[in-house]
Every structure is written in C-alpha cells, then in structure tokens.
C-alpha cells in the first residue's frame, strides 16, 4: 500500500521531470556531436555547463536582456570548447586530458564569474524565459513548451549546418580522419569547430537550467557527461530502429534525456536514496554501453561452417 501511495504522487512530479529532461536534452545533443559525430571523448562539458549557468545569471543580475544573457552563455561555451580543441590539436594533448584540463580551469573561472559558490535569481524581479514556478501552468510560457520550441529550432539549425559542405567535412573528420586528410580536409580545424559548437550547446543548456531552477551553482555541471551519455545511449537503444534521419537521431537523444529523468523521478518517488543517484546513473550508462558488446558476443547467430566453406570455394 505504501508503494501505491508513493506512485500516486508521481503524476504531479512528471511535468518537472519532463522539463528537466528537455533542458538536459540540449546538453545531450552537444554530447552527441562529440561522442558520435566527432568520435572524441570530451569531458569539458562538466565545466562548460556550469559556465553557461554562471554567465547567464550574472548577465541577468547586471540588467541584461534574457536573450542577450543566453547569447553570452552560448559564446562562453563556444570559447570553452575552442580552448579544449586548441589543447588537443595545436598542443597535442589527448582529447580526454584536454577536456579534463579545461574542466578543471572552468571551476575556478566559474567561481570568479559569480564571485561566490552560487548566485540566485528571482523570477519576480527578473524577466526569465523559463521558471520552475510555471511548469504546471497551461500557458505558452510553460517551460516544457518553451524548451520544445528552443530544441526544435536548434535541431533544425544543426540539421541544416551538417548538410552544408563544412558540416559534411566535420562528419567526415569523425568518421575517417585519415581519408579526410587525404581529401584535403583540415581535420584539426574541424575538431576545434566541433568541440566549440558542442560546448556552446552545453553552456546554453546550463543557462536555461539556471533560469529554470532560479540559481547558478559552481558544481551544477558535475556529472553532466554521465547524464549526457545516458541520454544518448538510451535514445539510441530505444529509437535507433525507428529514427534513421540525422535530425530524428537528435530528437531521440532529447527523448532519451526525458526518459532518463522520468526514471530518476520514479526511483525517487519509490523512496530510493537520493545520495546514490550518481551511482545509479553510472550503472545505467555502463549497462547500456555493454549491451551492444553482449549482443555481438553472446547472442549473435553462429555462422555455419558449410556457408564459410562455400564462400571460400
């Protein structure tokens, strides 16, 4: 009976879970660009996510328009990714280590931007784009509606960009760097550009989350890469057979983030210890990463020897 009583509270918490999933879905699309398109493991996102939130809140507190604040957060993320790209390509530092170095630096930079560990922003005093307060309202300014619009616009822009000559060159760089160089493509430039664009999206997501929750925190991006990977992997596992188009693949990533947060909300509603959430997230990512390997090793149909002999004949 206690479980049923807990589950009765779940519908009231679903709008908030969906809103958070949509916000983190934008971050997950950024992770998708590096993880799947560039084939680069970028850990900068744990820092650039917080940078986006810090820049956005401080711009709003200084009296800037909400759109200007979001743009400044986006530019801060672009710069963060650019630094990681330069460390990796120009200085020859491995991508993972370059991301860690930038992430570590951004912690201090975020503290310097805000002046302290966190900064609050009141929806009653500032004109915010989204807020947790409106999540259950049936109106245009509902965060779910606003983030769906923002996500649709971003996916449309990315779909167009990756269909251009430059976008195709970036995709070719991630798919086959050696062949790309043989075709005269500047792979280093494309890697830097891809990392910058990815972290720009991550910072934009952080800016939106800071508005939604009403504050920016120096540690708000901690574990962001795990959430991003979880969204990517869940989206691919559930929708890969349905969504083949590049734009729809990005939609699946966003849906993966929503599903992730709904599952997290369900687990919390059932009384799971909130202190173990990071452990749960890491376990989910590990299992979904292992599924393709398990399928290939333990569940693939063995090739009959007769067929092999026929091919070799």
Predicted regions and their residues:
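Membrane-interfacial amphipathic/re-entrant helices at transmembrane-helix boundaries
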Residues: 1-27, 55, 63-68, 140-141
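Helix-loop-helix "hairpin" substructures at the membrane interface of multi-pass membrane proteins
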Residues: 80, 140-225
């Amino acid at each position: 009976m206690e479980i049923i009583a807990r589950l009765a509270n779940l519908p009231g918490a679903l709008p908030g879970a969906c809103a958070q999933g949509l916000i983190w879905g934008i971050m997950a699309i950024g992770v998708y660009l590096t993880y799947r398109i560039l084939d680069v493991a970028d850990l900068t996102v744990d820092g650039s996510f917080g940078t986006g939130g810090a820049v956005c809140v401080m711009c709003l507190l200084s009296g800037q328009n909400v759109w200007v604040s979001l743009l400044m957060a986006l530019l801060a993320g672009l710069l963060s990714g650019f630094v990681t790209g330069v460390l990796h390509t120009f200085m020859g530092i491995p991508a993972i280590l370059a991301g860690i170095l930038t992430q570590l630096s951004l912690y201090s930079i975020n503290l310097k931007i805000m002046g302290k560990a966190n900064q609050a922003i009141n929806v009653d005093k500032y004109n915010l784009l989204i807020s947790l307060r409106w999540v259950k309202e049936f109106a245009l300014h509902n965060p779910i509606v606003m983030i769906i619009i923002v996500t649709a616009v971003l996916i449309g822009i990315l779909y167009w960009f990756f269909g251009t000559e430059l976008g195709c060159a970036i995709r070719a760089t991630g798919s086959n760097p050696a062949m790309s160089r043989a075709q005269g493509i500047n792979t280093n430039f494309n890697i830097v550009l891809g990392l910058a664009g990815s972290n720009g999206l991550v910072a934009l997501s952080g800016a939106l989350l800071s508005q939604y929750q009403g504050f920016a925190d120096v540690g708000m991006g901690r574990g962001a890469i795990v959430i991003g990977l979880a969204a990517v992997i869940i989206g691919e596992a559930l929708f890969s057979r349905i969504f083949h188009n590049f734009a729809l693949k990005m939609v699946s990533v966003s849906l993966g983030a929503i599903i992730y947060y709904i599952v997290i909300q369900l687990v919390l509603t059932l009384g799971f210890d909130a202190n173990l959430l990071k452990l749960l997230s890491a376990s989910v990512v590990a299992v979904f990463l292992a599924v393709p390997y398990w399928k290939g090793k333990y569940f693939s149909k063995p090739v009959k020897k007769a067929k092999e002999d026929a091919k070799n004949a």
